[in-house]
Each structure stands twice: as structure tokens, then as C-alpha cells.
């Protein structure tokens, strides 16, 4: 797993309180990991802070899964 994926996974585990093995590429933050809309906003803010990037609102809406987050951050870095 890439450094970005490891860091994203750590943020997801810490913010959502889920088991690390549940955070897989296809895991939906809402459907699979139990996040609500506020959790997803907090995740995006945590990703922005961790990686020093800005995620526009329209892009944030497309980040639905762990894999989406890793891809967006990889492309933005």
C-alpha cells in the first residue's frame, strides 16, 4: 500500500472508529463504514490538512469510497 493510502486509512480509522481491515479500496464511507454527512465533511477537512491540499466542494462530493479518496489525493499531490 502506498504512503498516501496508509495515511488516508489512518485518518479514516481514527475519524470513524472502524477496524483497519474494513477500510478497503471499495469501502463506501457511508454505506460500509457507517459515516454520516458530517463525518464525510470532517474526513475531507482532515485529508486537506494532512496532505496540504484543497478539495473543492464539487470534488468532495465525488469522494465516496476509500479508493476515491486515495486516487483524488494521489492526483492532486
Curated annotation (Swiss-Prot):
Domain Carrier stretches: 2-77
Keywords attached to this entry: Cytoplasm, Fatty acid biosynthesis, Fatty acid metabolism, Lipid biosynthesis, Lipid metabolism, Phosphopantetheine, Phosphoprotein
GO annotations of cellular component type: cytosol; membrane
Pathway where this protein functions: Lipid metabolism; fatty acid biosynthesis
Compartment(s): Cytoplasm
Record's comment on post-translational modification: 4'-phosphopantetheine is transferred from CoA to a specific serine of apo-ACP by AcpS. This modification is essential for activity because fatty acids are bound in thioester linkage to the sulfhydryl of the prosthetic group.
Main location (coarse class): cytoplasm
InterPro entries documented for this protein: ACP, ACP-like_sf, PKS_PP-bd, PP-bd_ACP, Ppantetheine_attach_site
GO biological process annotation, one example: lipid A biosynthetic process
Family: Belongs to the acyl carrier protein (ACP) family.
PANTHER family assigned: ACYL CARRIER PROTEIN (PTHR20863), CARRIER DOMAIN-CONTAINING PROTEIN (PTHR20863:SF76)
Name listed for the protein in its UniProt record: Acyl carrier protein
